[in-house]
Amino acid sequence: MIIWHWVQNHRLLSVLILAFVIVSSAGGTAWALVFRTVSSPVGLREALRIYRREQTDKMLTTLRNHLPAPGVYTYRTTGGESLSLMGVARAFPSTTSMIVDDGTCARISWVPITQHTETMTECSGANGTLSVPRLVTTESIAGSNTTSTIDCPATAYLLPAYATAGDNWTATCTLRSPSEKIVLAGQDLGPATVTVAGQSVTVEHTRFTLTFDGTEAGTNPTDFWIVPSTGLVVQEKEEVGVTSGGVRYSENMLSTLTNLEPRT
């Protein structure tokens, strides 16, 4: 859903490279332990446990009539992520979960593996608008643990008011650490139909692209196929290509909903 940033300065990169040089010079293969890319899939049972834990003491509000029903949704997924450093790469599981939390705004968390999660806050507004005030990615890869938080204004739409094909919108968001401005450019690509469990679902196809031009440089376009009346993400496609500190991070994913009813 959003760009992950992990190289915040050159010191971490230098330490990793130095470790590789020292160990490899000994003629061993222990360097693989330093750069081993761990991938622990989050199954449905674990996703349900996370959802139930986060629902404690939360209550429904009237605004939720225009947001996805809370619960755990299952998606058919392809794709993966990689770093240019030492060929670090891993694939996402073929089945992943999105956890929709209860609240005034919905928190939608894609949890393919425990080492990589993406959370989008989705709020409903007047005239059918769906906005995205916050995007959070947590990542553990190549020995580095990071959390990337992007805050956006009310005009950062997932779906604008009276959405029609060809609509365009922009907003300026802020990356918390390092503090940098990020441009969000949105586009409505029009209505579409997606088949879910044998049922045809009418959706609106939108895209928003995050452009980074600071410590990180690159783009992060994400396509959403959304049910306008509920904000349910029926399909999502994400591409990431960003360079930071001389290291390039790449991600691609396509997730399609397999059942319209969530598990709770």
Predicted segments with their positions:
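Intrinsically disordered, low-complexity regions
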Residues: 4, 57-60, 64, 138, ...
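Acidic, serine/threonine-rich low-complexity disordered tracts
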Residues: 23-123, 173-264
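N-terminal Sec-pathway targeting helices
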Residues: 2-22
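Secreted/surface-exposed cysteine- and glycine-rich disulfide frameworks
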Residues: 142-196
